[in-house]
Each structure stands twice: as C-alpha cells, then as structure tokens.
Amino acid sequence: MANGRVNPTFTLEDQGINGLGAVHYNLIEPALIQEALKREEGTLGKGGAFLVETGKYTGRSPKDKHVVKTPSVADTIWWDNNAEMSSEGFDALYADMLAHMKGKEYFVQDLFGGADPAHRLDVRVITELAWHGLFIRHMLRRPERGELDSFTADFTIINCPSFKADPAKHDCRSDTVIALNFDRKLILIGGTEYAGENKKSVFTLLNYMLPEKGIMPMHCSANHAVGNPVDTAVFFGLSGTGKTTLSADPERVLIGDDEHGWSERGTFNFEGGCYAKTINLSAEAEPEIYATTEMFGTVIENMVFDPETLDLDFEDDSLTANMRCAYPLNYISNASETALGGHPKNIIMLTCDAFGVLPPISRLTPAQAMYHFLSGFTSKVAGTERGVTEPEPTFSTCFGAPFMPRRPEVYGKLLQEKIAKHGATCWLVNTGWTGGAYGTGSRMPIKATRALLTAALDGSLADATFRKDANFGFDVPVTVHGVDATLLDPRGTWEDSAAYDAQAQKLVEMFAENFAQYVPYIDEDVKAVAIG
C-alpha cells in the first residue's frame, strides 16, 4: 500500500525495492508528526515541536562510515581518512537490509541537496522512522509539490536503524554501518537513530562530486549584507567554534549555518534548514534559535524535558552534551529566501584555542589561509570537572575531516584558486581562551568577537595598524574601535609572560608536527609561511 505524491515512473518498486508494508511518499510536516506520534517515536512538545531521543547513539559514528572501493573511485578517495568496504560486502549488506525491510512501513522524501539548481543533487531518502523524514525535510531543500511528479533521484539513502550489520559478512567494523557506494548511487545506514547521519551523508556526497565541476564545498556558515548579496562572508569552523552563533547576525542576512558551495556564480547553501546545538541555549544570547525550540515541526533531539509541563532543560546534558534542534531556515527572520550569495569578500576561519595563545583576530595572506585551512586547528576541552586543565588540541583538515572523501589538498587548491580569482580577505578568529589557558584564563568575550567581526566585514578593520605575530607570522591589529586593546595582544593578557611563551612554543611545535603530512603536496608559497 502506498500513499502520498510521487513520480509514477520512479516508485520504490521501480528502484527494485519490493515487498515493503505501507510506503508514505513525500508527506508534509503535520502528517509526518501524526505518523510519528501514532508509532510512539517521540512526544509533541510546546508549539508543536517534536521531542525525540536517539538511544545508544547521540552523535555521528565516523569510524563506522565506509566507502565502497570500486575501480572508479579507488584513486580519488582519501583512504587514510575513509574506511573501505568491498563491493561484495556492500552487495550482501544491501540484500540483507532489503530482506529486513520486507513487510515494514517506510517513509520516502524526495529532496534537493543545494540551493543552486545548476549544481544541486536530487536525493531520495527512505526512512524507517517518520521523524527522520521530518528531520530531512528540514535539512535538505524541498521541491515544489508539482516538481515531485517528475522527480528522479541522483542518489538514494536508505536509513534503517533496526537493522544490525554483521562485520564478518558485510565487511564493516560493527553492527552500525554507513556505507557509500558511488557506482550504485546508494547510501545504506543501519544500527543508529542519530539523525545527523542523514544530513552528513549528503554533505559527503557533495564534497566528493562538486570538486569535479570546479566547485569548492565548504563546512562553513555564510551570511551577506542586507540588500547586498555581493557582500558575502563565510565562516569555516569545527563543531563548537561559533559557526551558527556568529553567522546569525541581526545586521546581516543568513545564507546558511553549516554547508555551502562556492561556484563560478558565488556562494550557495546545500541545505534548507539548521541543526543547532541547544546546550546552554538562552533567549538572551540567541533569541532567534531559542524561539525555534517552540515552533511547529522543529525536531528537538536528545533534550531532557519536564514530562508534565514539557519545558525543555537547556542545562541538563545527562542524555548528551550534543543535544540539538533541527528547523527550516525560514524560522529565522533574517534568513535569505534564495540561500544564495556572491563570491565571499571575507573568509573567516574560526578556532577555539584552549591554550589561550592565539589573538582574537588575525589577518591572513592567501598562502597563510591555505595553511590554516589544511591545518584546521581547534581544541576540544577535556571536561568541566576541577583539575582538568589540559586542553585537547585537534587538527581537523579543511575544518571538517570526517566529511572529506578526497585528499585535503584537492579542497585546499580549490580554495586557493578562488581566493586568488575573487580577492577575498581572510581572517583567523579565536573564540577560545584569553588571559591564560583553559582552567586559568577565561572564554573570549562574545561581544569583543562580534565587534571585531563587524569591523572586518564592514571594511574598517583594513585601516587599522597591524603588527606581525612573532610566533605565528600573521598580522594582528593593534587597536580596534570598541575593543579593549589589551585583548588584542594575548601575551599581555597573561599574568606570567614566560608561561605564555612556553605555551605558544608548544602550539607552534604542534602545528609543525601536524603539517608535515601535507608538505609533499603543497606549493612553495605555502611552505614559506608554515608555522615553526
């Protein structure tokens, strides 16, 4: 039995997927919520938000993500970073998953990955959970209803959390699996209910396919000046560095908060929604994002709530610190209707430096920008219990290593070419610690970060006096209107300057050690600006 709206020549049966129970094609939000409630997948929250728990997995499983190694991709995938799967293992996995699906109810969503029609990917997402259908409707871009009648997918994703993989039979690592097959244009996800796997699978596809067209895929947020899409800025950064927070600027138009492409026409969002962290979210600091948590259809993932009043607890991280909400872009009042922008005038690379040695903002040359893009430095903080003062540095190349199927230099060279052609100004912004490392210093004041970004984006920072940083070689402004000058010189914010020097030297050595892996692949101008 099938219901909903679908291209009559592109049903699941036409794809060779037979024998399922009820199949629901392209249901809209109210119908998906009704189905999810009927199946007891979650709770209806305030304002019609949908509250879910994802069980064992409350985050992505990068070690369980595999790419099928076939002759067509064997030489282009970065195998150091992507686990391989044999074609035989994938074929067995697909056959067993289809057998497992027989007689069960499924939800199908036909969607677009990419706001630019010239470069979008048409994706069919088949989900066992109704709320996963709701989630992916928010995260990807929705066709007009009439467009569904002729929709044919470039790629299909099947997500079946109740299916458990067999590592011996399916050539994978555990009973959880995310398997990408570029030849069969198919992604299989099993053994995890965490919804983020759906969105990041599409991101990984675009990250592989777009460079062949000369398009730079970016793990970044983006915004543009009001009434002037040509004045676009992109914000690269790993999770927790401030991509979502800093791009949500009431003075600028939001293009998107996480995944974008840079084509010959400019910037475009891959997505149609946002997937924001909600831990410690407040109406004062982030009113727009906070408001979405009580809007119709917003998916609230892994948040503790009062069973009687349905009030959400933004502080309780007992389920996970990675609690999130997913909502369509149009829930943010200053979001772009087209999700398109110009060529970036400013490129911001966000880092959370828990060593407390990087300045709050630095200007980068194009070669330095390539260096920092390939390095992808930030810090994870070990924990909030007392006595844990040792930050955990991490280098995630391209500010998004888990989603990069190709070698990092492919993306780095694309970025370098685009900066050279369009003349973007590049900045490194530290949203981490100042006045000492994590444990002794304090978090960089967000007001100061916003003031520095405003000066960078409106062009006034270009007129400032800059000094060259002795440790890292980039240019640092000496004074910026509205920002405490002492903040701009990290060494001066430390009580013990010898301790600062030792900590800075430690970070310099880490940069040098990490970057050694890229030296054989890069140009002389980038080698010349390498730290250490």
UniProtKB/Swiss-Prot annotation:
UniProt-annotated binding residues for Mn(2+): 200, 219, 258
Official protein name in the record: Phosphoenolpyruvate carboxykinase (ATP)
Enzyme type, top EC level: lyase
Protein's cellular compartments: Cytoplasm
Cofactor requirements of the protein: Mn(2+)
Pfam families: PEPCK_ATP
A single BP term in Gene Ontology: gluconeogenesis
Keyword Lyase attributed: yes
Domain of life (superkingdom): Bacteria
Family in the record: Belongs to the phosphoenolpyruvate carboxykinase (ATP) family.
Keywords annotated in UniProt: ATP-binding, Cytoplasm, Decarboxylase, Gluconeogenesis, Lyase, Manganese, Metal-binding, Nucleotide-binding
Primary role: Involved in the gluconeogenesis. Catalyzes the conversion of oxaloacetate (OAA) to phosphoenolpyruvate (PEP) through direct phosphoryl transfer between the nucleoside triphosphate and OAA.
Catalytic activity annotation: oxaloacetate + ATP = phosphoenolpyruvate + ADP + CO2
Annotated residues for binding of ATP: 200, 219, 237-245, 286, 324, 449
EC number: 4.1.1.49
Cofactor comment: Binds 1 Mn(2+) ion per subunit.
Pathway the protein acts in: Carbohydrate biosynthesis; gluconeogenesis
GO function terms (MF aspect): ATP binding; metal ion binding; phosphoenolpyruvate carboxykinase (ATP) activity
Residues reported in the UniProt entry to bind substrate: 60, 194, 200, 324
Family annotation (NCBIfam families): pckA, PRK09344.1-2, PRK09344.1-3, PRK09344.1-4
GO cellular component, one term: cytosol
